[in-house]
Regions:
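Soluble catalytic regions of membrane-associated enzymes that act on cell-envelope
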Residues: 1-264
């Protein structure tokens, strides 16, 4: 029921000894400052957390079902990694690890608590360097205490189910992936016009039960679990095709990763 952890100060002392650093006061006891010689280019960054997306679903990694033709095509023309592992089995684990560089801790949701913890991570570093940080999710912003946690830890704007038309909500997890992506584009266009670099998170949901296949998408698979992967891939394709038409596209880095691995 409970994790057996060593005392916090002992863990900090051990890590400082191993890393040979004293940390940075007010940021982290094991942080180090990195100074770049070159002037930062300040490209926009769009990071897409793909719900439960795993390598075993892609043709490149051995799947014969042809569920992810677009992701497979991106893999061949992008900077890609064969041994990349998402953290934990819950979305909050993957977000926490990816954005704030902490490992997932079993049986704990680091985003919840009576007092919202303050962390240094990718969002806060980018914000300190002049970025506008936006987060788009399909469901209610209070889910997993995301709204309070993200606003406390570097995000300026959060868009969630309460911002979307009620007729676009399809289940308890909110709107479809392709609607989320369509909704985000005009907002990103406005931010680009302000000539301030932006860091944007898009958190998808489609590949999470209960699965909802929109009427306007026609999958070739017969199993619902496969159809939803086809839809998720198609929705990403639609977003990237539209993003490619925008003036900010060439100055933007797109990062796609699975938020976590679904329990098998």
């Amino acid at each position: 029921r409970y994790l057996h952890l060593m005392p916090e100060q002992e863990a900090i002392t051990n890590m400082q000894s191993i890393l040979q650093r004293k940390g940075i006061e007010g940021i982290s006891p094991i942080a180090r400052e990195v100074k770049c010689a070159a002037v930062p280019t300040q490209k926009n960054v769009v990071l897409i957390f793909m719900e439960s997306m795993s390598a075993n679903l892609m043709e490149h990694f051995g799947s014969t079902k042809k569920l992810t033709p677009f992701l497979d095509s991106l893999y061949l023309e992008s900077l890609s990694f064969d041994h990349f592992y998402s953290a934990g089995i819950h979305t909050n684990h993957g977000m926490y690890a990816t954005l704030y560089s902490f490992p997932a801790i079993m049986k704990r949701n680091a985003m919840k608590g009576a007092v919202v913890p303050v962390y240094s991570g990718l969002p806060t570093v980018l914000k300190d360097n002049g970025y506008r940080n936006l987060f788009f999710m399909t469901h209610e912003s209070q889910y997993d205490n995301m709204n309070a946690f993200l606003r406390t830890n570097g995000f300026d704007e959060i868009y969630a189910q309460e911002n979307y038309p009620k007729d676009k909500v399809v289940n308890s997890f909110g709107v479809q992936d392709d609607f989320l992506y369509q909704y985000a584009l005009p907002i990103l266009n406005k931010r680009a016009e302000e000539r301030q670099p932006f860091f944007t998170i898009l958190l998808s949901i489609s590949n999470h039960p209960s699965y909802v296949i929109p009427d306007y998408f026609k999958p070739h698979s017969t199993k619902l679990e496969d159809q939803i992967v086809e839809y998720a891939d198609w929705a990403i394709r639609q977003f990237m095709q539209e993003a490619r038409k925008q003036p900010w596209f060439e100055n933007t880095i797109f990062v796609l990763l699975g938020d976590r691995k679904s329990v098998v």
